[in-house]
Amino acid sequence: MERTTIMTLDFSKPGEAGYQSGFANEFATEALPGALPHARNSPQRAPYGLYAEQLSGTAFTAPRGHNRRSWLYRIRPAAVHRPFELVSGERRIVADFGDSGDVPPTPPNQLRWDPLPMPAQPTDFVDGWVTMAGNGSAAAMSGCAIHLYAANRSMRERFFYSADGELLIVPQEGRLFIMTELGRLDVEPFEIAVIPRGVRFAVALPDGRARGYVCENFGALLRLPDLGPIGSNGLANPRDFLTPNASYEDREGAFELVAKLNGRLWRADIDHSPFDVVAWHGNYAPYKYDLRHFNTIGSISYDHPDPSIFLVLQSQSDTPGVDAIDFVIFPPRWLAAEDTFRPPWFHRNVASEFMGLVHGVYDAKAEGFVPGGASLHNCMSGHGPDADTFEKASAIDTSRPNKVGDTMAFMFETRTLIRPTRFALDTAQLQANYFECWQGLKKHFNPEQR
């Protein structure tokens, strides 16, 4: 059991409560000695006058290996707040990507965007969200939404949670100090954070501004993939995932609680901080992971293997071997395959691919795809390296290995069509000339010369 004594939320400096190591472990942590009840979950009187509250992330009857829940011991139950009211205004968040939803027809074109501009007005993490694309429906608990965020103000008297799905946050610029009910995550670019569905949190920006990506998973919880013949180690190792120790604040005042439900934002007055969980135990909790710890697998003979070797996390579907969402990264790595076209090959995919770039250059695109930008190649849309990359990769000496060092790209790959929103198709950040990167590919065919 981990114990801490952090009792106030101070966003002006890094957190001090520390972390517990492992993925979806049965964690136990308390900020006051003896705050966790002994040998039971819901005693008649919890220690320190706390309330016992269960937070369920799966059905009660889910198989034990998939069942996710945590018991929280808090100063006030989560039910203590005023009624919610609908937040009116611009619909920048989308949660229904079916034909009845507010999305335009999905083009088969390859799409690419420049980074989302930093806001001109003070904007926090929640107000800085905009939905770019997605599939399925939050109401049906199936599919996902892909958002971008750009913010320049910390959340001080405001708290947020999404009832629609768990949030996979990929920072591209600026650190995020994320305080949650279950403890604090300090996250920087090259790291990711996952906030479970329903967990309340606030984000501070120690660098003054931040930008990045969010994949909101409506469906089955993210998990580590099976490794198959890779063996018992490799890819994202469980020990490198960090879940926060308990820390709490007992603070009263005039605050705002914002809820996201079915793609709409709702607000309620709340007279205390929801970060009042003094102790908790269970396996449903926020976590972070450093992408630089990924154990990259690749070919040491010939050919470029399928990108599934770069899989970090997956959300499984009801079809064995077919994931609803794959989170894949393209990290720094050595390329050693001989007589092989080493960049990612030309491809048409039954799945749909939304890509982002955290740092550097993606090895399949010489220019145009920049950090903070994004691209979308939907089902059966042809894509691959641009003309300049193809010419260079076709001429290099493959008897010598080379290192792709200055990069960190990622992909949200889904089994169903990723439908861009009206914002994504109308924004000035959409690169109208993206298709031109392939128009320079020359005809090399000569039937007289093999």
From Swiss-Prot:
Q: Where does homogentisate bind?
A: Y362, H383
Q: Which UniProt keywords apply?
A: Dioxygenase, Iron, Metal-binding, Oxidoreductase, Phenylalanine catabolism, Tyrosine catabolism
Show the coiled coil region(s): none
EC annotation?
A: 1.13.11.5
Q: Where does Fe cation bind?
A: H347, E353, H383
Catalysed reaction, written as an equation: homogentisate + O2 = 4-maleylacetoacetate + H(+)
Q: Which GO terms describe its biological process?
A: L-phenylalanine catabolic process; tyrosine catabolic process
**Record-annotated active site:** H304 (proton acceptor)
UniProt-recorded Gene Ontology molecular function terms: homogentisate 1,2-dioxygenase activity; iron ion binding
Top-rank lineage group of the source organism: Bacteria
State the pathway, as annotated in the record: Amino-acid degradation; L-phenylalanine degradation; acetoacetate and fumarate from L-phenylalanine: step 4/6
Give me the Gene Ontology terms describing cellular component: cytoplasm
A Pfam short name: HgmA_N
What this protein needs as a cofactor is: Fe cation
Q: Which family does it belong to?
A: Belongs to the homogentisate dioxygenase family.
Function, in words: Involved in the catabolism of homogentisate (2,5-dihydroxyphenylacetate or 2,5-OH-PhAc), a central intermediate in the degradation of phenylalanine and tyrosine. Catalyzes the oxidative ring cleavage of the aromatic ring of homogentisate to yield maleylacetoacetate.
Quaternary structure and partners: Hexamer; dimer of trimers.
Q: What is this protein called?
A: Homogentisate 1,2-dioxygenase
